[in-house]
């Protein structure tokens, strides 16, 4: 159609204008000039494809990945060779290493027989040690024997447990995420306060206390400018943007830079992103009147796993990993028992959010349990604080399934209610239009917060975006737009009279040139 031709010519012109190299531009122009000017009726398609095949996104990404892999391999080879060459001339370090290994194996990890001089000689051969906070006995108890101690998952660590390792280091680097699960204290707040008052150290509780503290909080308090001095590791590569997009919006305040490209994701049979399955279940107490279980919801989870295993565990998808996360231990145990009886428990990890802290799976199922019968306090506990929900939904790399009572969960006033409404939004877009869902994904990556299917004075629009007082309506035009141009123009004028800008985006542009669409949206919203 004429509109498709116009779109194609405009897209080619935009792409042509971005070519920086004049010689290359002239070469491509030899084939594209008539097309760009609009004079060519019969396009030389084969010649055009040949000229630009080196610039296809897949080819460019493949070349970049190949260069990255080569650089990584070369870097490791150089470092390895330099290390081996240096070690081959250091006889004292080799002898010390042999002696330490002998003592380590004989004494089951204890190093009490090793003197500081031998240990320091050994460190020249093995300068990097990886250990847990519970295993410092494998390292010589001497001050400052390590130049740097790196503490990972610092919000899970108490200062008390880390003191033996901190004692051994000159400097420490603390890595953590305060939006993840906190450490579980071994003393109550009241007991700790009583001890602090008894020994007159009340003023140190905020900095060095155990019950309401962790290594990350203490480290922040030690920085000269507190939170201002934190170095943010904000680039996120793990999760599909529709999954991490919720947490970025509602928990991380848009600080994350989403780097996983939905156009080049690992395609899996059941689809990528977020899915919702509604189950009107009921809650009851677990064994010995502890915890909570929602059996109809758990049964639906097991059915879903059976379907997923049938679709995603054969051929090229046989390596996909799966997990089920739930807030309640009784629900975890019920699901595990049922999956075992069905012969499906193998290669499916089931647990609470604490089980999955620091872990990830290709496919995750979130079973919130909240439904009729649960107490108000138990339902509130699921979402307050928000860390439990955040960990539960961000373990998924490719696909996240919410299986639960959507109405009951949506009625919650905190993060659970917001998440269910987000799931509903994505599910509605998935059922309506692939291009709308794709554009929503790209807008989420950009950090936008689009309202979807908004009704403005009886006129329903696809998306509404706001920025510094500007209001932009974005409409994704499919084939039906060609038959309703006059009506659409009338709608646009009506919306403009109400103070909205209107941007119409061809569905084909969303499929083929999403970056250009996002650029147009940013321009309309007057982003710098």
Regions found by a protein language model. Give the residues of each.
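Helicase C-terminal subdomain and adjacent C-terminal extension
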Residues: 188-231, 340, 373-454
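Short glycine-/polar-rich loops that comprise or flank the Walker A/P-loop
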Residues: 145-146, 168-171, 224-230, 274, ...
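Conserved helicase/translocase motor-coupling segment
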Residues: 254-337
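Short beta-strand-loop-alpha-helix junction that forms the active-site gateway
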Residues: 455-493, 497, 506-512, 523-525
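Conserved helicase C-terminal RecA-like lobe
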Residues: 307-394, 405-411, 419
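Conserved helicase NTPase catalytic core signature
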Residues: 2-145
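Conserved nucleotide-binding/hydrolysis micro-motifs of P-loop NTPases
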Residues: 135-136, 155, 178-182, 188-190, ...
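ASCE P-loop NTPase helicase motor core
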Residues: 109-252
């Amino acid at each position: 159609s004429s509109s498709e031709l116009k779109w194609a010519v405009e897209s080619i012109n935009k792409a042509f204008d971005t070519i920086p190299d004049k010689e290359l531009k002239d070469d491509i122009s030899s084939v594209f000039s008539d097309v760009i000017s609009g004079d060519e009726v019969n396009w030389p398609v084969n010649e055009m494809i040949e000229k630009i095949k080196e610039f296809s996104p897949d080819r460019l990404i493949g070349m970049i990945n190949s260069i990255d892999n080569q650089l990584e391999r070369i870097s490791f080879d150089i470092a390895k060779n330099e290390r081996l060459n240096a070690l081959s001339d250091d006889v004292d370090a080799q002898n010390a290493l042999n002696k330490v290994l002998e003592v380590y194996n004989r004494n089951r990890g204890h190093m009490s027989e090793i003197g500081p001089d031998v240990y320091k000689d050994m460190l020249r051969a093995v300068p990097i040690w990886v250990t847990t906070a519970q295993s410092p006995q494998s390292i010589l108890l001497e001050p400052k024997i390590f130049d740097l101690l790196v503490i990972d998952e610092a919000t899970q660590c108490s200062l008390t447990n880390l003191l033996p390792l901190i004692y051994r280091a000159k400097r420490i680097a603390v890595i953590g995420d305060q939006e993840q699960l906190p450490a579980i204290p071994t003393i109550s707040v009241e007991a700790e306060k009583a001890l602090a008052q008894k020994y007159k150290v009340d003023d140190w509780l905020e900095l060095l206390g155990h019950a309401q503290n962790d290594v990350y909080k203490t480290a922040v308090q030690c920085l000269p400018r507190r939170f201002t001095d934190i170095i943010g590791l904000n680039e996120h590569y793990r999760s599909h943007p529709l999954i991490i997009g919720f947490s970025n919006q509602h928990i991380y305040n848009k600080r994350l830079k989403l780097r996983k490209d939905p156009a080049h994701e690992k395609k899996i049979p059941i689809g990528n992103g977020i899915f919702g399955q509604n189950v009107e279940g009921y809650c009851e107490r677990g064994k010995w009147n502890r915890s909570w279980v929602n059996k109809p919801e758990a049964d639906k989870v097991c059915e879903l796993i059976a379907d997923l295993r049938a679709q995603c565990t054969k051929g090229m998808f046989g390596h996909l990993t799966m997990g089920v996360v739930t807030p309640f231990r009784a629900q975890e145990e019920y699901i595990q028992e049922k999956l075992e009886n069905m012969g499906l428990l193998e290669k499916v990890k089931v647990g609470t959010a604490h089980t999955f802290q620091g872990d990830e799976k290709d496919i995750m199922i979130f079973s919130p349990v909240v439904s009729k019968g649960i107490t108000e306090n138990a339902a509130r506990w699921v979402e307050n604080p928000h860390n439990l929900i955040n960990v539960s939904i961000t373990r998924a790399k490719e696909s996240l399934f919410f299986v639960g009572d959507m109405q009951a969960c949506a009625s919650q006033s905190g993060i659970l209610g917001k998440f269910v409404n987000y799931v509903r939004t994505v599910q509605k877009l998935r059922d309506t239009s692939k291009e709308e869902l794709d554009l929503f994904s790209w807008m989420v990556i950009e950090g936008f917060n689009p309202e979807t299917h908004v009704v403005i004075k009886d006129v329903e629009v696809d998306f509404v975006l706001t920025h510094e007082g500007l209001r932009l309506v974005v409409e994704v035009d499919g084939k039906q737009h060609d038959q309703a141009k006059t009506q659409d123009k009338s709608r646009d004028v009506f919306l403009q009279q109400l103070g909205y800008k209107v941007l119409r985006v061809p569905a084909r542009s969303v499929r083929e040139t999403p970056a250009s669409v996002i650029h147009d949206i940013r321009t309309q919203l007057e982003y710098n």
